[in-house]
C-alpha cells in the first residue's frame, strides 16, 4: 500500500506532492512496527544486538549480488531494447520527483543505501519476519516475509517493464531470494548488521546503475 500510494497513485502529481506523499507513507510504514509492539502486543520494543556475527557473510553475499547486477547491466541490459525503453521512463520519474541533478541523485543514493536499507531491514526482517517466526515455522516465515518484501518491488519494476513481462518477475524473484537470505541470516545471528550491510551494498549497486541510466545513457 505504501508503494502504491507514493509511486503509482501520486505519480502524476507535482514533485512536492509526490515527495510529501512519500514522506507520509514511509513515516507511517516505519512507525507501525513500534506502535504495534507497544500498543497491541503491550511489549517494550527490544533493541536488536549489533553483533558482528554474520557480517562477513553479509558482505560477501552483498558484493556477489552487486557484482552480478553491475555485470548484467554492463554486458547485457545496457544495450537491450526493452531496457532502453524503460530507461526513458526511469528518467522521467527521476525528473518528476525533482532529483534530476547528479548531485541530488547521488545524495538520494547515499541516503537509500545507508539509511533506507536499515529501515527496510528493521521493517521486513525485525518486524515482519520476526512476527511471522513467532506464529509459524521458520521456512514459512522466510517465504512469506520475502514475498511481502518482493511485492512492493513488483509495483516499481512492473511500472517500467510491464506487469506481465518475464523481466519484471525475474528481477522480482531475485528480490525475494535476497529477502530470504537476509531473513535467514537474521534468524541465525539475531543481528541486523549482516543483513543491513548486505542490503546497502545491493542498493548502492542499484543506484550506481540508476546514475548511469539517468546521466549517461543517451535519450531516445
Predicted regions and their residues:
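Transmembrane helix-loop-helix hairpins at the membrane interface
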Residues: 103-220
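N-terminal, membrane-interfacial amphipathic/helix-forming hydrophobic leader that caps
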Residues: 1-57, 204-220
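Alpha-helical transmembrane segments
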Residues: 1-6, 61-66, 144-148
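Juxtamembrane helix-loop-helix connectors linking adjacent transmembrane helices
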Residues: 14-19, 45-116, 134, 166, ...
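Juxtamembrane "helix-exit" motif on the non-cytosolic side of transmembrane helices
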Residues: 6-16, 76, 154-160
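Hydrophobic alpha-helical segments of integral membrane proteins
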Residues: 37, 62, 66, 70-71, ...
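Membrane-embedded alpha-helical segments of multi-pass transporters/permeases
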Residues: 34-38, 70, 74, 154-158, ...
Amino acid at each position: 500500500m505504501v508503494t502504491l500510494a507514493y509511486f503509482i497513485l501520486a505519480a502524476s502529481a507535482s514533485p512536492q506532492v509526490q515527495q510529501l506523499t512519500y514522506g507520509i507513507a514511509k513515516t507511517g510504514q516505519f512507525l507501525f512496527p513500534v506502535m504495534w509492539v507497544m500498543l497491541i502486543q503491550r511489549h517494550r520494543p527490544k533493541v536488536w544486538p549489533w553483533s558482528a556475527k554474520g557480517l562477513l557473510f553479509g558482505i560477501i553475499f552483498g558484493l556477489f549480488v552487486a557484482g552480478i547486477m553491475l555485470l548484467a547491466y554492463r554486458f547485457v541490459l545496457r544495450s537491450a531494447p526493452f531496457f532502453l525503453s524503460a530507461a526513458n521512463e526511469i528518467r522521467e520519474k527521476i525528473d518528476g520527483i525533482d532529483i534530476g541533478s547528479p548531485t541530488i541523485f547521488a545524495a538520494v543514493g547515499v541516503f537509500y543505501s545507508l539509511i533506507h536499507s536499515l529501515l527496510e531491514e528493521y521493517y521486513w526482517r525485525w518486524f515482519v519476519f520476526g512476527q511471522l517466526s513467532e506464529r509459524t515455522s521458520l521456512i514459512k516465515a522466510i517465504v512469506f516475509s520475502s514475498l511481502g518484501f518482493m511485492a512492493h518491488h513488483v509495483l516499481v519494476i512492473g511500472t517500467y517493464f510491464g506487469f506481465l513481462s518475464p523481466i519484471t518477475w525475474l528481477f522480482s524473484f531475485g528480490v525475494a531470494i535476497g529477502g530470504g537470505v537476509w531473513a535467514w541470516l537474521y534468524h541465525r545471528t539475531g543481528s541486523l548488521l549482516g543483513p543491513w550491510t548486505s542490503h546497502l551494498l545491493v542498493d548502492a549497486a542499484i543506484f550506481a546503475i540508476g546514475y548511469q541510466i539517468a546521466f549517461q545513457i543517451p535519450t531516445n
